[in-house]
């Protein structure tokens, strides 16, 4: 995408706060996404910071000052304002103050997606770092699907996204900022979507915008004709600045970040107990609340008590502009807490923390990670073996596996019973066949029938009935039963048509076979 196709976003940045928020609201509601943010580029610090935003996601607890019913749009707009107010309250360490309004939000009132939106305020991105910084530097939109599945190197807010289930994030560059939209749905990259989002800001651009600064900026700007000229501002940091002296005049942005990195790393070593609050995929809101609220007094008191030595971790800035200087106001306590929140929480997930551990502890951590990886692989294998899985979490996989194993056990028991029954029938049939003996002799009109088979009730009567049907009249019968074996000797006379020996045997066998089938 060439630079000529990029919307002149400095017009948007120069619009009033409400108008900018209205544009963000229109853009995010038109696509039904969760939130929208405008990252404003600060030329003095060379960094993208929070400019404005609009939250369009789920709400856990609603608090409003309106006595009557409000529309959904009004409620969402008020929610975005309340989230920003809560962030400022937490930043100032006044979350427990009795002076707060009854309608003000508390950390426990927020959903995970609201926490994601709230914590975005604390982030900043020097181009080309982070998604917004990359989009701004490349002058091309950046689309990320599966933001909750990547690591922190790919997406710096990946831990937040995983907790809030933010799956898709897109950053669209403007000349003085970046528009970011996010959703809990997984959406494929769509160029028409990007063009549609740009159109909302393009259609509302003003031709003569007023100069504006982002909400993060604290510069006092003199309204002079020199404001329209482009001035290259060089800022350097002395060694005293890195030690915390507030008297330096020239500050380097790069060395400032290095200082914050060193100090936040040192602070981590003195607060190692807070690392346990932040496990992969854990509840991020609890961590941030603990960071800002669990020791607010000590944090602020430490900052104030050391003011004689270090007034603020963000030292006084003096920007050279010709012969004049514009001095920046500082807020030692608020900026100190903000710095702790910005730099301390990401380092809780930084892999470099393992380098500070003893060798034995490091080996234990590596072994534990490998054990978890193997356990996850086993769960994946187990999931592939179970034909039906209700959900993809470990508890559901185990539950479905147990149910499937019980089903297999029941099926095996049924098959074993069926096999035993069939085997018993085969054995019984073979026994009957081997024990069946029928001998028939017919001499003139005298008939002698000798037979042996398995006994059953009514067997003798059935045999006599068959002989009668063949025209053979029984004259004498001798029978015996021994261990379910039936033996009989029948003498008879042929009356009428003489039946053959084969016909008599066949008839007797039919009677016995009929008994076997029963």
Swiss-Prot record:
Q: Which family does it belong to?
A: Belongs to the bHLH protein family.
Quaternary structure? Homodimer. Interacts with MYB4, MYB5, MYB6, MYB82, MYB113, MYB114, MYB75/PAP1, MYB90/PAP2, and TT2.
Q: Which compartment or compartments is the protein found in?
A: Nucleus
User: Which molecular function GO terms apply here?
Assistant: DNA-binding transcription factor activity; protein dimerization activity; transcription cis-regulatory region binding
**Free-text function comment from the UniProt entry:** Transcription activator, when associated with MYB75/PAP1 or MYB90/PAP2. Involved in the control of flavonoid pigmentation. Plays a key role in regulating leucoanthocyanidin reductase (BANYULS) and dihydroflavonol-4-reductase (DFR). Not required for leucoanthocyanidin dioxygenase (LDOX) expression.
Instruction: State which residue ranges cross the membrane.
Output: none
Gene Ontology biological process terms in this record:
flavonoid biosynthetic process; jasmonic acid mediated signaling pathway; positive regulation of anthocyanin biosynthetic process; regulation of flavonoid biosynthetic process; regulation of proanthocyanidin biosynthetic process; seed coat development; seed development; trichome differentiation
Taking the record's annotation, the residue ranges forming a coiled coil are 220-240, 405-428
Give the protein name, as stated in the record: Transcription factor TT8
* Ranges where the bHLH domain occurs: 359-408
Domain of life assignment: Eukaryota
- Which Pfam families does the record associate with it? bHLH-MYC_N, bHLH-TF_ACT-like_plant, HLH
Keyword terms: Activator, Coiled coil, DNA-binding, Flavonoid biosynthesis, Nucleus, Transcription, Transcription regulation
Annotated Gene Ontology cellular components are: nucleus
Q: In which tissues is it expressed?
A: Buds, flowers and developing siliques, but not in leaves, stems and roots.
Keyword DNA-binding carried by entry: yes
Q: What else is known?
A: TT8 might interact with TT2 and TTG1 to modulate the late genes of the flavonoid pathway.
**Gene (name only):** TT8
């Amino acid at each position: 995408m060439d630079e000529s196709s990029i919307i002149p976003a400095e017009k948007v940045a120069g619009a009033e706060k409400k108008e900018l928020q209205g544009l963000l609201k229109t853009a995010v509601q038109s696509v039904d996404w969760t939130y929208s943010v405008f990252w404003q580029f600060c030329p003095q610090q060379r960094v993208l910071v929070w400019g404005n935003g609009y939250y369009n996601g789920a709400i856990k607890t609603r608090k409003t000052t309106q006595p009557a019913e409000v529309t959904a749009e009004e409620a969402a707009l008020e929610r975005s304002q309340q989230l920003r107010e809560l962030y400022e309250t937490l930043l100032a360490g006044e979350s427990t103050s009795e002076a707060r309004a009854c309608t003000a939000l508390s950390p426990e009132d927020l959903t995970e997606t609201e926490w994601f939106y709230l914590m975005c305020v604390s982030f900043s991105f020097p181009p080309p770092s982070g998604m917004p910084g990359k989009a701004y530097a490349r002058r091309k939109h950046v689309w990320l699907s599966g933001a909750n599945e990547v690591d922190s190197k790919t997406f710096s807010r990946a831990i937040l996204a995983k907790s809030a289930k933010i799956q898709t994030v897109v950053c669209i560059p403007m000349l003085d900022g970046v528009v970011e939209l996010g959703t809990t749905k997984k959406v494929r990259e769509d160029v028409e979507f990007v063009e549609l989002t740009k159109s909302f800001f393009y259609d509302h651009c003003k031709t003569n915008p007023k100069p504006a600064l982002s909400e993060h900026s604290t510069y006092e700007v003199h309204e002079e004709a020199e404001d329209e000229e482009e001035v290259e501002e060089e800022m350097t940091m002395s060694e005293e600045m890195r030690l915390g002296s507030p008297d330096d005049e020239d500050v380097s942005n790069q060395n400032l970040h290095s200082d914050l990195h060193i100090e936040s790393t040192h602070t981590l070593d003195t607060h190692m107990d807070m690392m346990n609050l932040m496990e992969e995929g854990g509840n991020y809101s609890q961590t941030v609340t603990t960071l800002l609220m669990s020791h607010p007094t000590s944090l602020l008191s430490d900052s104030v008590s050391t003011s004689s030595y270090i007034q603020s971790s963000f030292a006084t800035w003096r920007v050279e502009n010709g012969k004049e200087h514009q001095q920046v106001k500082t807020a030692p306590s608020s900026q100190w807490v903000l710095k702790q929140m910005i730099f301390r929480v990401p380092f809780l997930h930084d892999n470099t923390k393992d380098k500070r551990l003893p060798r034995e502890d490091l080996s234990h951590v590596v072994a534990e990670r490998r054990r978890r990886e193997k356990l996850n692989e086993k769960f994946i294998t187990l999931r592939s073996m179970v034909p039906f899985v209700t959900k993809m979490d470990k508890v559901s996989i185990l539950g479905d596996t147990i149910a499937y194993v019980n089903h297999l056990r029941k099926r095996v028991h049924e098959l074993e019973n069926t096999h035993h029954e069939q085997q018993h029938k085969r054995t019984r049939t073979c026994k009957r066949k081997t024990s069946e003996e029928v001998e028939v002799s017919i001499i003139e009109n005298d008939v002698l029938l000798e037979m042996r088979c398995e006994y059953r009730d009514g067997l003798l009567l059935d045999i006599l009935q068959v002989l009668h049907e063949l025209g053979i009249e029984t004259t004498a019968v001798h029978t015996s039963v021994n261990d379910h074996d039936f033996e009989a000797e029948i003498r008879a006379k042929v009356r009428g048509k003489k039946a053959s020996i084969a016909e008599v045997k066949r008839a007797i066998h039919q009677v016995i076979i009929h008994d076997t089938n029963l």
